[in-house]
């Protein structure tokens, strides 16, 4: 009996590394193993310590191997959308065979021709996704193999990223003893599971509240049109709690998960919990509403930053609405807070598969789902047709347009990739700026309560 095709997704996140193992059984993905390990080798989505990242990858893979009872050798790796560019590309060749029948070799050659374009030396091609083939002027062809023709043309989407970042990811995966089967841009992976086909077609905003950064993406006509990365995420919420309550990061994370609300309207001011305060023998009592206001302040800042970027491309004019996922979105009230700030009805996505019922698994799950749905022609173009003999869904289930849509280059924050902001010299200054704001309401209350607690 032939074993079903196995897919392994690797999500190297700022706060954790996650692995999902899935099998394609009767054109359905079955999750057979998962792994999760705390990550200490990344900062704001950037690998800063290769050895620690390798250790986290090995641990997560080992967990997934034990649960799935298989040996993992090859993984599909998610790539964050920091400084990712998606551009249309075009290639044309003469069909090589004497009988003019288009073969796998011709598909590979026309893709190579599409790659022949000026790519800056600091960037690297991550993948090229075929969208439409043209044979002797006849367009709209999804798979030209077996057809007779003289001229073969290809319209495709070329995805490029910073060479240094891609190299660091490759280095970590290879040092962990694994082979990279393919790369998948994380917003595309998230969209594969978090959005319906209609939502991807009509136009929908997808927000991923990660640990080290938050990403707002726009999917339209089945393609990624726009992506913006804010270098703040759930980890910054934890740091705020740690700084303001004068407690350790581990305590702050535990407090956030056990007592935290993303909206102060949902929390109760008469519910108290103990906080182990640095420099004091006895725990300090803090009410849930105060904690919620600390969390809400940071999430509000993240949402407002994402809104400014989305307003620039008029993303809110699209009819698909807003979908929110990612680890930080699991805090009660995160969706309602987004609705009030962004002015759109929002839907919360969490994987429904057993073992994955946490939004922090969305990307890893999306990676395997995206890879499984790629048509066979994609793998042929990459020269890997023998590795994927049974695609999860037939090619006609994929949505293609007769011409590749014009891609809007992803927009990014003014900060350089992996660089500290020049506006503030340290994280503490940012927190002080939040606390010392001249605005009334929450900020004034924070100042007053801090004085009461620590004076």
Regions picked out by a protein language model, each given a short descriptive name:
Residues 1-16, 20-74, 79-204, 248-249, ...:
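Nucleotide/phosphate-binding catalytic cleft detector across ATP-hydrolyzing
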Residues 10, 19, 77, 173, ...:
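Residue-level signature of catalytic and energy-coupling elements of molecular machines
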Residues 80, 261-263, 318-337:
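Glycine-rich phosphate-binding loops at beta-strand->alpha-helix junctions
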Residues 151-152, 220-223, 314-321:
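Short, surface-exposed connector motifs at secondary-structure boundaries
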Residues 176-181, 274-315:
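Adenine-nucleotide phosphate-binding core of ATP-dependent small-molecule kinases
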Residues 195-264, 268:
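Acidic, glycine-rich loop-and-beta core segments that form the ion-binding/anion-interacting portion
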Residues 225-226, 239, 290, 346-354:
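Short beta-alpha connecting loops at secondary-structure transitions
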Residues 351-398:
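Glycine-rich phosphate-binding/hydrolytic loop that grips phosphoryl groups
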């Amino acid at each position: 009996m032939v074993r079903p095709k196995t897919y392994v997704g690797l999500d190297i996140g700022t706060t954790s590394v996650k692995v999902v193992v899935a099998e394609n059984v009767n054109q359905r993905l079955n999750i057979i193993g998962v792994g999760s390990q705390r990550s200490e080798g990344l900062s704001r989505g950037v690998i800063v310590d290769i050895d620690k990242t390798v250790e986290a990858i090995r641990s997560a893979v080992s967990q997934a191997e034990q649960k799935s009872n298989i040996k993992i050798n090859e993984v599909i790796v998610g790539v964050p959308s920091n400084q990712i560019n998606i551009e249309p590309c075009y290639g044309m060749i003469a069909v090589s065979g004497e009988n003019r029948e288009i073969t796998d070799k011709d598909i590979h050659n026309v893709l190579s021709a599409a790659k022949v374009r000026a790519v800056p030396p600091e960037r690297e091609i991550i993948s090229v996704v075929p969208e439409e083939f043209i044979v002797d002027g006849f367009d709209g062809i999804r798979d030209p193999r077996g057809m007779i023709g003289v001229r073969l043309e290809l319209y495709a989407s070329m995805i490029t990223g910073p060479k240094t970042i891609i190299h660091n990811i490759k280095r970590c995966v290879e040092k962990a003893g694994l082979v990279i089967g393919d790369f998948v841009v994380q917003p595309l992976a998230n969209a594969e599971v978090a959005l319906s086909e209609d939502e991807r077609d009509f136009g929908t905003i997808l927000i991923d509240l990660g640990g080290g950064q938050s990403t707002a993406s726009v999917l339209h006509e089945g393609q990624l049109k726009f992506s913006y990365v804010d270098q703040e995420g759930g980890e910054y919420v934890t740091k705020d709690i740690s700084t303001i309550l004068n407690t350790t990061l581990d305590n702050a994370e535990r407090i956030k998960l056990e007592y935290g609300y993303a909206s102060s309207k949902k929390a109760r001011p008469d519910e108290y919990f103990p906080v182990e305060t640095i420099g004091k023998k006895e725990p300090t009592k803090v009410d849930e509403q105060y904690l919620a206001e600390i969390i809400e302040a940071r999430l509000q800042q993240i949402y407002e930053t994402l809104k400014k970027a989305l307003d620039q491309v008029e993303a809110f004019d699209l009819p698909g609405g807003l979908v929110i996922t990612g680890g930080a979105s699991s805090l009660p009230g995160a969706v309602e807070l987004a609705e009030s700030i962004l002015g759109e009805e929002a839907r919360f996505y969490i994987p429904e598969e057993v073992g994955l019922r946490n939004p922090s698994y969305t990307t890893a799950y999306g990676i395997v789902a995206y890879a499984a749905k790629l048509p066979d022609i994609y793998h042929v173009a990459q020269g890997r047709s023998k590795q994927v003999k049974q695609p999860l869904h037939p090619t006609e289930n994929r949505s293609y347009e007769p011409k590749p849509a014009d891609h809007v280059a992803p927009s990014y924050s003014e900060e350089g990739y992996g660089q500290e902001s020049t506006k503030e010299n340290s994280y503490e200054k940012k927190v002080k700026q939040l606390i010392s704001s001249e605005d009334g309401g929450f900020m004034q209350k924070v100042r007053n309560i801090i004085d009461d607690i620590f004076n």
